[in-house]
UniProtKB/Swiss-Prot annotation:
It comes from Parafrankia sp. (strain EAN1pec). Residues 1-61 form the TGS domain. This is Threonine--tRNA ligase. Zn(2+) binds at residues 353, 404, 531. One of its GO terms (cellular component) is cytoplasm. The gene is thrS. It is an enzyme of class 6 (ligase). The lineage of its organism: Bacteria, Bacillati, Actinomycetota, Actinomycetes, Frankiales. Its main location: cytoplasm.
């Protein structure tokens, strides 16, 4: 056997190694227990992958993002094997890793019960303990069809691969290039225990799955279409250690306490009446108060930053979205057309941008007007499948704080930098502080425009992002059909990441709508367009803030900022006068004049997460004072009314948390 040279890459450090021909990645990293797979030539591979001369090999450790995804994918196989051991008639769907976990879909005779899930977890634990070996086999299409003849969904995926090539569902299982099956083999006898169509890679053995849990089950349509059979989906999670699993479960429990859907009901903020339909929220008075404050503050900041407010209708003729390309690229996300005016198709608008373009085009424009920044709280409608809608974070009727900026080419770098700074500053005003940026590039096969235009737009966004002193993460292929985008990712109080603002450079729509302005030299030039949604949507940002603060919004955002609590009914008029003073200064205040005892009134206000409580009894009335009680239970007695009012106003004006 001859020797070959390979390079081991660890971050910025590279080490050249001489190894025997046929050496595997496992042998290269022998003794490094945390290494569960490798990246060879930029592609993820099993540790059993043989190395060739010139290969650049990077270890993938179990505690890295890629490592966790591989562990979770392998655990999905183990859970699927457990299901088929317990329910032999179960047919397999797909089982990909997802954020913080994995799922696997099954066609079974009945939904899984909690007892079933316990049994599945127990059997999966036995499989992991057995140390079954993951072994990759390359097969032909005919061989795959023969081996998986009893798995109709796998057969369908094989067909999708051969006919479509890049089908998303097929890609989860079969990927690109050759077809592969992974066998789970008995570590002693080598006997086949189970197999699945899969592109891999996987951990070497089931013992390389350090910690996992089966979480829940739910119904899911095959390939996400309501026209297809309904399957049963088992969700699970897997981590690099038991401690990491416990920490995740703690975060999950904390997230459940903060669930905006539960808080929305408890705090009487919003609801989703079945009479209206899934994904369509109704905001109650208290929720409406929060939205009003959010929008009013945003409106004020936008005016200060040179934005001009516009309003556009909720429906439009199809012509508009034919020109924009939405009907070609976004039709699945739109509601069906309404036929009006003698057969013309009208659509509920899914996006505001084409209408803002029409405002720009409504008259001749000069370079002196640029940059032109148009802004709207525009409600749009998107047909999200009923199984996908989720509280306020995924809805069908949504209000975007939507801006479209039109500028000259030479203004783009400055405008992008200004927009990003404005976005981050405004998000910080709402109490979010921990950010990173994500740059999404051209989506393969789903984009309009030339390579040069995309490269130029992407580079402009990259330059703007680099000036913000924040981490920049690449999202290859994640851009919109008309241009690349930067998204602001924010981490909340319990460390979860939320995508918030998006900023997109668009070369395409100005061309499609033949937009022009008169340049300084008298020629007609094409403006450049920036799409920008700061909150993303009002509804989603509302939910994020509610969960970030666990319902205890800072005083300036709280729907009720102050509650007056009289010790007896005799003190109601006094507190009513105090409330009037606060109300005159714009404070949202209530007086609890119910028949409840004082202690219950305090508990009620605390449950409603009211920032300030003003208590009054005989002594307070005599002194013109109140007892000033805070949300955390601390209390100052004998505070003069004017001092209490001033302190409340100060907290609201400075937007501080209490």
């Amino acid at each position: 056997m001859s020797d070959v040279r390979v390079t081991v890459q660890r971050g910025q450090q590279a080490e050249e190694r001489v190894v025997r021909t046929g050496t595997t990645a496992a042998e290269l990293f022998d003794g490094e227990r945390s290494v569960i797979a490798a990246r060879v030539g930029g592609l993820q591979r099993d540790l059993s992958h043989p190395l060739a001369a010139g290969d650049v090999v990077e270890p993938i450790t179990v505690d890295s993002p890629d490592g966790r995804a591989i562990v979770r994918h392998s655990c999905a196989h183990v859970v699927a094997q457990a299901v088929q051991d317990l329910f032999p008639k179960a047919r397999l769907g797909i089982g990909p890793p997802i954020q913080d976990g994995f799922y696997y879909d099954f066609d079974v005779e009945r939904p899984f019960t909690p007892e079933d899930l316990k049994a599945v977890e127990k059997r999966a634990q036995e499989i992991i303990k057995a140390g079954q070996r993951f072994a990759r086999r390359v097969v032909s299409e005919d061989e795959a069809r023969a081996e998986l003849a009893d798995e109709p969904y796998k057969i369908e995926l094989i067909g999708l691969k051969s006919s479509a090539g890049d089908d998303a569902e097929a890609g989860v299982e079969v990927g690109e290039g050759e077809l592969t099956i992974y066998d789970n083999l008995d570590p002693k006898s080598g006997e086949l225990c189970w197999k699945d169509l899969c592109r891999g890679p996987h951990v070497p053995t089931t013992r390389h799955i350090p910690a996992f849990a089966v979480q829940r089950s739910a119904a899911a349509y095959w390939r996400g279409s309501e026209r297809n059979p309904q399957l049963q989906r088992i969700y699970g999670t897997a981590w690099e250690s038991r401690d990491a699993l416990k920490a995740y479960q703690h975060r999950l429990a904390e997230a459940e306490k903060r669930d905006h859907r539960r808080l929305g009901a408890e705090l009487d903020l919003f609801s989703f009446p079945t009479e209206i339909g899934p994904g369509l929220a109704v905001f109650h008075p208290k929720g409406g108060a929060i939205r009003t404050v959010m929008e009013d503050y945003s409106r004020r900041r936008h005016i200060e930053a040179g934005y001009e407010f516009v309003n556009t209708p909720h429906i439009t003729k199809s012509d508009l979205y034919e020109i924009s390309g939405h009907l070609d690229w976004f039709a699945d996300g739109m509601y069906p057309p309404m036929q009006l005016d003698g057969g013309a198709d009208y659509y509920l608008k899914p996006m505001n941008c084409p209408m803002h373009i029409l405002i720009f085009r409504s008259r001749g424009r000069s370079y002196r007007e640029l940059p032109l920044r148009l802004f709207e709280f525009g409600t749009v409608y998107r047909y999200e499948k009923s199984g996908v809608v989720h509280g306020l974070t995924r809805v069908r009727g949504l209000t975007q704080d939507d801006a479209h900026l039109f500028c000259a080419r030479e203004q783009l770098p400055t405008e992008l930098d200004t927009v990003l700074k404005f976005v981050l500053g405004l998000l910080r005003d709402y109490g979010l502080e921990d950010f990173y940026l994500e740059l999404s590039t051209r989506p393969p096969g789903k984009a309009i425009g030339s390579d040069k235009e995309w490269e130029e737009a992407t580079e402009l966004l990259r330059e703007a992002a680099s000036k913000q002193d924040l981490e920049l993460v690449m999202d290859e292929g994640g851009g919109a059909f008309y241009g690349p985008k930067i998204s602001v990712q924010a981490r909340d109080a319990i460390g979860r990441t939320w995508q918030l603002s998006t900023i997109q450079v668009d070369f395409q729509l100005p061309q499609r709508f033949d937009m022009t302005y008169q340049a300084a030299d008298g020629t007609r030039q094409r403006p450049f367009m920036i799409h920008r949604a700061l909150f993303g949507t009002i509804e989603r940002f509302f939910a994020i803030l509610l969960e970030h603060y666990a319902g205890a919004l800072p005083p300036w955002l709280a729907p009720v900022q102050v509650v007056g609590i009289p010790i007896t009914d005799e003190h109601v008029p006094y507190l009513t006068d105090v409330a009037a003073k606060l109300r005159q200064r714009g404070i949202r205040v209530e007086v609890d004049s119910s028949d409840d005892r004082m202690q219950k009134k305090i508990r009620t206000a605390q449950k409603q997460k009211v920032p300030f409580m003003l208590l009054a009894g005989d002594e307070d009335v005599a002194k013109g004072a109140v007892s000033f009680r805070f949300r955390d239970g601390t209390q100052r007695n004998g505070v003069p009314v004017d001092e209490a009012v001033a302190e409340i106003l100060d907290a609201v004006e400075r937007r501080i948390q209490v």
